[in-house]
């Protein structure tokens, strides 16, 4: 499918010495210079990257978007793991935002959720997809048919899961988007403080620590593969490679702080983790 025909990866890098040094995104000056030199049609970035627990701040996103717009391209932001750290597309310059139901929205995994800027909506009409299931222009036509009061069919939809997603999105809206964002920030800070107080070091460097995905170093394979937490009734995610030229002995474990239950009950969420660490 030649998706894409060519690609350049701007890797994160360590910001210190030692085998448990923290990691930060590629310096923004280097990213901007590469965009201006290579003139890509699209720049993809993860808002929150889940192997490292790293978040790209709004000013970083804005600088990337401005640079790619200068050369006639567009910016695509992966927000699947953003949790309740909402992204303002207009303020950051993001053209295409992609997310999903199953993390911050507390929904069932059933679809992709795609938001388009005015420029992206205009550009998509001139594209042809090489995929049937992932033909974004076709799905856009389906959506716009329904919005106009009509009916159209492309593939069978996971209707029940979509209805559940709609319900939980309405629940979050009624509770307050800003309120739940503040809960996400507070819970992430509390969990990171808990880990650091026990000498557990963060993979993400200061200034780039995501509040919804906390990735920390370990030297214990039973923590890395989540078996020790599972034995205590907690589900964590196994650590995975960064694929950024990390040392051979790189080992981590991941804690996802997603879902309204965790966010609305931060004290309980932190206490459960603390009890597991003390066991």
What annotation goes with each model-predicted range?
Residues 1-13, 235-244:
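Active-site cofactor/substrate anionic-group-binding motifs, chiefly glycine-
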Residues 2-4, 44-46, 76, 99-100, ...:
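Short beta-strand segments
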Residues 26, 30, 59, 63, ...:
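Conserved active-site and cofactor/substrate-binding residues in soluble primary-metabolism enzymes
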């Amino acid at each position: 499918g030649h998706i894409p025909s060519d690609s350049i990866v701007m890797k994160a890098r360590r910001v210190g010495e030692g085998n448990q040094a923290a990691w930060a995104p590629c310096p923004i000056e280097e990213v901007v210079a590469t965009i201006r030199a290579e003139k890509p049609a699209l720049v993809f970035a993860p808002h929150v990257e889940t192997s490292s627990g790293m978040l790209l701040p709004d000013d970083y996103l804005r600088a990337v978007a401005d640079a790619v717009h200068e050369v006639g391209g567009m910016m695509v932001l992966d927000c699947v793991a953003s949790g309740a750290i909402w992204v303002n597309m207009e303020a950051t310059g993001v053209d295409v935002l992609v997310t999903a139901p199953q993390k911050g929205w507390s929904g069932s995994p059933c679809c992709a959720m795609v938001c388009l800027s005015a420029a992206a909506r205009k550009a998509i009409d001139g594209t042809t997809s090489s995929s049937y299931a992932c033909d974004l222009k076709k799905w856009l036509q389906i959506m716009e048919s329904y919005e106009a009061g009509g009916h159209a069919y492309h593939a069978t939809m996971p209707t029940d899961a979509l209805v559940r997603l709609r319900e939980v999105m309405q629940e979050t809206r009624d509770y307050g988007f800003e309120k739940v964002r503040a809960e996400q920030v507070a819970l992430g800070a509390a969990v990171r403080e808990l880990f650091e107080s026990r000498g557990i070091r963060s993979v993400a460097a200061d200034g780039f620590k995501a509040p919804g995905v906390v990735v920390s170093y370990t030297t214990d394979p039973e923590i890395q593969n989540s078996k020790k937490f599972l034995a205590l009734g907690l589900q964590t995610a196994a650590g995975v490679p960064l694929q950024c030229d990390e040392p051979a002995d790189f080992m981590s474990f991941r804690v996802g702080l997603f879902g309204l239950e965790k966010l609305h009950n931060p004290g309980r969420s932190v206490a459960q983790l603390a009890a597991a660490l003390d066991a």
